């Protein structure tokens, strides 16, 4: 006998696709959603779809922005003479929580990982270089250092 009937197994499979959601957590999410009212499930699905439709990437920094608001608020309202380079939007959220940084960001969209086929061409490095103009006074690299990126940066 199967552990779960097909509709529940498919739902577990979908939750399992989320980062940091393993099998047991996916099962808990799926079973909890079955305990929710139909209205709650519809609202959850509606918010998920609305977010997917209405959240885009800023054409300047690569951060999230609402559809129709491009460039994002940070790019429009902040000091563009200081650029903080980060791996992804989670890093922007973390830095914004401090309330201390007043410059703009540039999201690379990942890290160098030649073993995974991720080189400079797969990251937003060209876009970063285009942003570095004489008006830019400082570029802060706020990524986690690792042996691969150091090797790549030092070799011709």
Please provide the spans of the model-predicted regions.
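Alpha-helix N-cap/helix-start motif
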Residues: 41, 117-118, 149
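Extended interfacial segments that mediate partner engagement and assembly in macromolecular machines
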Residues: 26, 76-143
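Cys/His-rich Zn2+-binding cysteine-cluster or related metal-binding knuckle/ribbon modules and their
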Residues: 2-8, 13, 17, 25-83, ...
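Conserved small/polar residues in nucleotide/adenosyl-binding loops
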Residues: 151-156
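Acidic, metal-coordinating catalytic cores used for nucleic-acid/nucleotide bond scission
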Residues: 143-150
């Amino acid at each position: 006998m199967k552990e779960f009937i097909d509709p529940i197994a498919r739902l577990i499979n979908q939750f399992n696709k989320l980062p940091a959601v393993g099998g047991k957590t996916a099962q808990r999410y799926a079973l909890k959603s079955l305990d929710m009212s139909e209205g709650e499930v519809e609202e959850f699905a509606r918010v998920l779809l609305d977010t997917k439709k209405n959240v885009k990437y800023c054409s300047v920094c690569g951060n999230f922005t609402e559809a129709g608001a491009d460039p994002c608020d940070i790019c429009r309202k902040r000091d563009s003479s200081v650029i903080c380079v980060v791996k992804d939007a989670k890093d922007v959220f973390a830095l914004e929580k401090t309330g201390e940084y007043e410059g703009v960001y540039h999201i690379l969209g990942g890290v160098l990982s030649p073993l995974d086929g991720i080189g400079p061409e797969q990251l937003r490095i060209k876009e970063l270089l285009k942003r570095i103009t004489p008006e830019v006074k400082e570029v802060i690299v706020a990524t986690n250092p690792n042996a691969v990126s150091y090797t790549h940066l030092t070799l011709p």
